[in-house]
């Protein structure tokens, strides 16, 4: 299992309707949006300070937010966990 698959599995467990974390299960796109904004500012701050050790951790936090949104979208049938990893790159 690679690290992304591991992260997806962790999020699935956190959001599991029967055994998941109560806080994670009650979150919605709207309720986690402020956390995403906060994590984005922390990424930008680490870049401004040129603190690449901190940046590594902050990017991990931001990636966790992306996985959180993807899990919720999957639960709602909007897309699956694979589809959001297929990036559309500019030509």
Range-by-range predicted roles:
Residues 47-48, 72-79:
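Short alpha-helix-to-loop micro-motif enriched in aromatics/charged/Gly
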Residues 4, 68, 79-81:
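Aromatic-residue hotspot detector
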Residues 60-64:
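Glycine-centered tight-turn and secondary-structure capping sites
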Residues 85-91:
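Conserved small/polar residues in nucleotide/adenosyl-binding loops
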Residues 53-57, 79-82:
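Short, solvent-exposed positions on alpha-helices
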Residues 1-55:
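Extended low-complexity intrinsically disordered regions
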Residues 65-72:
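Alpha-helical scaffold segments in carbohydrate-active enzymes
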């Amino acid at each position: 299992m690679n690290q992304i698959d591991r992260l997806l599995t962790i999020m699935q467990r956190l959001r599991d309707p029967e055994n998941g974390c109560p806080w994670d299960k009650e979150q919605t796109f709207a309720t986690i949006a402020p956390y995403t904004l906060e994590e984005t500012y922390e990424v930008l701050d680490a870049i401004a300070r040129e603190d690449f050790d901190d940046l590594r951790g902050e990017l991990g936090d931001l990636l966790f937010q992306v996985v959180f949104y993807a899990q919720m979208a999957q639960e709602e049938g909007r897309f699956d966990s694979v589809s959001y990893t297929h990036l559309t790159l500019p030509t």
